[in-house]
């Protein structure tokens, strides 16, 4: 230990040099390579009192999961918008994306999306039968001729 003038120990530089340039702070989101805010999610986890203590990896993991889900929904919604020849994603496109995807549909089954509407769905029982439709057309035409009133038959 170095003892300076007056008998006091000289302070040693710990961490960085005393006169050196200060490094620019790097956020945890940048370190993890994420777009979602790791620090904010960590703060929400602590404030929400979900547990007495929150580990350092928990907000990073949660931010990564949320970012992945958001990217997945946005990609599918963008595809739905393109299918409808639109350049802007609207709530309807988000709903179509979620409900048409099996896993996302199961995850968000109880979620209502405002202005999303519903999936187009007609019960097959209510649809007209195609085979019977073709067979009925000639029969209807012959019935129409036979069902004409006597006055109309006399005119033709």
UniProtKB/Swiss-Prot annotation:
GO terms, biological process: heterochromatin formation
Organism phylogeny: Eukaryota, Viridiplantae, Streptophyta, Embryophyta, Tracheophyta
Location in the cell: Nucleus; Chromosome
GO cellular component annotations of the record: nucleosome; nucleus
Subunit-level organization: The nucleosome is a histone octamer containing two molecules each of H2A, H2B, H3 and H4 assembled in one H3-H4 heterotetramer and two H2A-H2B heterodimers. The octamer wraps approximately 147 bp of DNA.
Amino acid composition bias (Basic and acidic residues), ranges on this chain: 130-147
Motif SPKK motif mapped to chain: 149-152
Name of this protein: Probable histone H2A.6
Annotated stretches, region: Disordered: 1-26, 129-156
Family under the similarity heading: Belongs to the histone H2A family.
A Pfam family annotated for this UniProt entry: Histone_H2A_C
Superkingdom, natural source: Eukaryota
Primary location recorded for the protein, binned into one broad class: nucleus
Function: Core component of nucleosome. Nucleosomes wrap and compact DNA into chromatin, limiting DNA accessibility to the cellular machineries which require DNA as a template. Histones thereby play a central role in transcription regulation, DNA repair, DNA replication and chromosomal stability. DNA accessibility is regulated via a complex set of post-translational modifications of histones, also called histone code, and nucleosome remodeling.
GO function terms (MF aspect): DNA binding; protein heterodimerization activity; structural constituent of chromatin
Annotated domain remarks: Contains one SPKK motif which may interact with the minor groove of A/T-rich DNA sites. Phosphorylation of this motif may regulate DNA binding. This motif is reiterated in both termini of histone H1 and in the N-terminus of sea urchin histones H2B, but its presence in the C-terminus seems to be unique to plant H2A.
Keywords for the protein's UniProt record, in alphabetical order: Chromosome, DNA-binding, Nucleosome core, Nucleus
Skewed-composition ranges (Basic residues): 9-26
């Amino acid at each position: 230990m170095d003892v300076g003038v007056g008998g006091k120990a000289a302070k040693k530089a710990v961490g960085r040099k005393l006169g050196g340039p200060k490094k620019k702070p790097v956020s945890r989101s940048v370190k993890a390579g994420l777009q979602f805010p790791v620090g904010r999610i960590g703060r929400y986890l602590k404030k929400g009192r979900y547990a007495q203590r929150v580990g350092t990896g928990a907000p990073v993991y949660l931010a990564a999961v949320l970012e992945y889900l958001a990217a997945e929904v946005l990609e599918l919604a963008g595809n739905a918008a393109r299918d409808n020849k639109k350049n802007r994603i609207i709530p309807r496109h988000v709903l179509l994306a979620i409900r048409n995807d099996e896993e996302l549909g199961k995850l968000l089954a109880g979620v209502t999306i405002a202005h999303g509407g519903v999936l187009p769905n007609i019960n097959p029982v209510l649809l007209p039968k195609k085979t019977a439709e073709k067979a009925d057309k000639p029969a209807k035409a012959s019935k129409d001729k036979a069902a004409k009133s006597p006055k109309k038959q006399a005119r033709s």
